[in-house]
């Protein structure tokens, strides 16, 4: 194969390689969006933390800072205890992620957006959900799982 034939072959291989990378990136973004959807379906379940157990990586390095957190919660075991206590005063919640922006790099992804909804407390009061949120996901054994969740009030 002469130099004249090598360049077109190289260009063709590069095009197929780039197309494969794009397809993988699209698949990963879709996977992160599915993990996000599962997270927000789990967060509205008022239980002992079982729903969240299905969407979080159960590792010692997961982190959580929620709207009622007084400290950074590190590790799955600490977080599981948190969810059990966190859910006690609620009778129900609705929460949706709006205006989400997703970025994937390798086996990590992050998503930033706004959480919007309403929480009904057991005492009959309601609380508006209107937070800025950052979620971090890790692809573990082919599955995107939450490894960090941080929410804060919107600046006034």
Q: What would you call each of these model-derived segments?
A:
Residues 113-120:
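Generic short beta-strand segments
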Residues 1-9:
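Bacterial N-terminal signal peptides that target proteins for export
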Residues 26-27, 154-156:
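Generic C-terminal helix-cap and adjacent flexible tail
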Residues 110, 130-155:
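Short beta-strand edge/turn micro-motifs at domain boundaries
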Residues 20-55:
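Short, low-complexity N-terminal intrinsically disordered segments enriched in polar/charged residues
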Residues 29-31, 49-104, 114, 128-129:
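A solvent-exposed, acidic/Ser-Thr-rich amphipathic alpha-helical stretch
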Residues 102-109, 122-125, 137-143:
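A short, structured loop/turn motif at beta-sheet edges
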Residues 8-19:
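Bacterial N-terminal signal peptides
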């Amino acid at each position: 194969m002469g130099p004249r034939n090598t360049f077109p072959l190289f260009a063709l291989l590069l095009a197929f390689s780039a197309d494969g990378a794009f397809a993988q990136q699209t698949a990963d973004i879709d996977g992160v969006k599915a993990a996000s959807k599962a997270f927000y379906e789990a967060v509205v379940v008022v239980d002992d933390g079982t729903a969240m157990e299905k969407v979080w990586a159960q590792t010692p390095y997961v982190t959580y800072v929620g709207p009622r957190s007084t400290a950074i919660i590190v590790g799955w075991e600490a977080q599981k205890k948190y969810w059990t206590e966190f859910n006690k005063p609620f009778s129900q919640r609705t929460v949706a992620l709006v205006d989400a922006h997703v970025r994937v790099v390798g086996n990590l992804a992050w998503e930033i957006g706004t959480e919007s909804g309403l929480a009904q407390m057991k005492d009959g009061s309601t609380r508006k959900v209107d937070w800025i949120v950052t979620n971090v996901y890790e692809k573990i054994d082919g599955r995107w799982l939450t490894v960090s969740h941080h929410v804060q009030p919107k600046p006034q």
